[in-house]
């Protein structure tokens, strides 16, 4: 019993450190065997007579039961120590998890600050940065465009620098609407007059008159002249 009490003493000290309360002195004495379990009634109970041997046996039995109760108390304390260790382990895990979460959040915020956008934008940017192996047409167009860009300046150098091109004149802005209408009518009449020019047969020296236009050609020419004149009238009316 004394060896058991001595082996249980370190656990009790650990319990005192975990719980923060001192172990009762009566429990310590019962574990260390400081109380003598004598056989004489005088030692166990000084006021008792020597003839009360049966009463001494009862007192010794009570003290044995008290020692057993103390041992049970020790077991309860050991269970409390085990429970306390489990609680400490769970608290340590929660603290570590909180530390990891804060560290991950700081890393994520720094990543967002570097990308300068929202999480969806950063994910989209990382997805767009991946090479697209399926879009071969787009890669071909890019390669063809770069090839043309490299070939075009070389051909221009070989051909030489072209002279200054004549600026195109917007006659619609220079000529007023009335003069433009007259110009268009003159152009129409010039076209009609060119049809009446003389022409020569390829084997003969005879001068012949122009072939008479058919009814369809004359109707078409008249329609074109009427269309030009109608358009000129619309322009004048608009002005």
Curated annotation (Swiss-Prot):
Post-translational modification: Phosphorylated.
Record InterPro entries: LURA1/LRA25, LURAP1
Residue ranges with Low complexity bias: 107-118
Residue windows of the LRR repeats: 55-83, 93-114
Keywords, comma-separated and alphabetical: Cytoplasm, Leucine-rich repeat, Phosphoprotein, Repeat
Domain of life (superkingdom): Eukaryota
Gene Ontology terms: biological process: actomyosin structure organization; cell migration; positive regulation of canonical NF-kappaB signal transduction; positive regulation of cytokine production
Subcellular location: Cytoplasm
GO CC term, one of those recorded: actomyosin
Annotated spans, Disordered: 107-140
In-chain residues carrying the UniProt-annotated modification Phosphoserine: 118, 126, 129
UniProt subunit comment: Forms a tripartite complex with CDC42BPA/CDC42BPB and MYO18A acting as an adapter connecting both. Its binding to CDC42BPA/CDC42BPB results in their activation by abolition of their negative autoregulation. Interacts with CDC42BPA and CDC42BPB.
Entry function: Acts as an activator of the canonical NF-kappa-B pathway and drive the production of pro-inflammatory cytokines. Promotes the antigen (Ag)-presenting and priming function of dendritic cells via the canonical NF-kappa-B pathway. In concert with MYO18A and CDC42BPA/CDC42BPB, is involved in modulating lamellar actomyosin retrograde flow that is crucial to cell protrusion and migration. Activates CDC42BPA/CDC42BPB and targets it to actomyosin through its interaction with MYO18A, leading to MYL9/MLC2 phosphorylation and MYH9/MYH10-dependent actomyosin assembly in the lamella.
Name listed for the protein in its UniProt record: Leucine rich adaptor protein 1
């Amino acid at each position: 019993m004394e060896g058991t009490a001595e082996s249980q003493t370190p656990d009790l000290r650990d319990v005192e450190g975990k719980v923060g309360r001192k172990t009762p002195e009566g429990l310590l004495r019962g574990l260390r065997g400081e109380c003598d379990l004598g056989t004489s009634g005088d030692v166990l109970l000084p006021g008792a007579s020597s003839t009360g041997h049966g009463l001494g046996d009862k007192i010794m039995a009570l003290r044995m039961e008290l020692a057993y109760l103390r041992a049970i108390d020790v077991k309860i304390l050991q269970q409390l120590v085990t429970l306390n260790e489990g609680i400490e382990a769970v608290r340590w895990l929660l603290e570590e998890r909180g530390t990891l979460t804060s560290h991950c959040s700081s890393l994520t915020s720094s990543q967002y600050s570097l990308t300068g956008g929202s999480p969806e934008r950063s994910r989209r940017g990382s997805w767009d940065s991946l090479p697209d192996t399926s879009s071969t047409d787009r890669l071909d167009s890019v390669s063809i465009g770069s090839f043309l860009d490299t070939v075009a300046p070389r051909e221009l150098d070989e051909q030489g620098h072209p002279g200054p091109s004549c600026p195109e004149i917007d006659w619609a802005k220079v000529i007023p609407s009335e003069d433009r209408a007259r110009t268009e009518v003159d152009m129409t009449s010039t076209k009609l007059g060119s049809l009446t020019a003389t022409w020569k047969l390829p084997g003969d020296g005879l001068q012949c008159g122009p072939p008479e236009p058919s009814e369809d050609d004359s109707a078409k020419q008249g329609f074109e002249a009427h269309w030009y004149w109608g358009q000129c009238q619309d322009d004048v009316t608009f002005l």
